[in-house]
A protein has these predicted regions:
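Short, contiguous alpha-helical
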Residues: 1-29, 69-130
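Helix-adjacent hinge/juxtasegments
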Residues: 21-63
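Short polybasic amphipathic segments
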Residues: 64-68
Length: 130
């Protein structure tokens, strides 16, 4: 639960910076989410928000800088923030997947999203199909 809450917190922090929402580090003041179902719902909403942000981007937006809150404003390129955010997601989602694999709980599908062969049904739910 701690890993998934951390992942959600970091997603919120960076997406707020990308959208110039002004919350900055105060996103850490949001309460932890206590149940797996509520975490799933919150993460899915955050994923949809990130997808919508990316859908609105133009190529000319990528080198533009937005401020991140590090106790002081630190400008970062949008493309660099997105790359960092995606890497962070991959790392911690993989970490949670590995933890579940060591239990009796079947971890979610993480592999087959883009190829036609063995594509997982959740691809359609996520709007990843062309």
């Amino acid at each position: 639960k701690a890993t998934l809450n951390h992942n959600l917190l970091v997603d919120r922090y960076y997406l707020d910076a990308l959208e110039q929402g002004g919350l900055g580090r105060t996103v850490a003041d949001l309460p932890e989410i206590g149940t797996p179902a509520a975490l799933r719902t919150a993460q899915a909403a955050q994923d949809r928000r990130l997808t919508a942000f990316c859908d609105r981007l133009e190529a000319s937006d990528l080198p533009r800088r937005v401020d991140t809150d590090r106790g002081r404003p630190v400008p970062e390129r949008i493309d660099h923030l997105l790359a960092h955010l995606f890497q962070h997601q991959i790392h911690h989602r993989g970490q949670a997947h590995a933890m579940l694999a060591g239990t009796g709980v079947a971890p979610p599908q993480l592999d087959e999203f883009f190829l036609d062969y063995d594509r997982h049904p959740s691809v359609a739910e996520l709007g990843l199909l062309p």
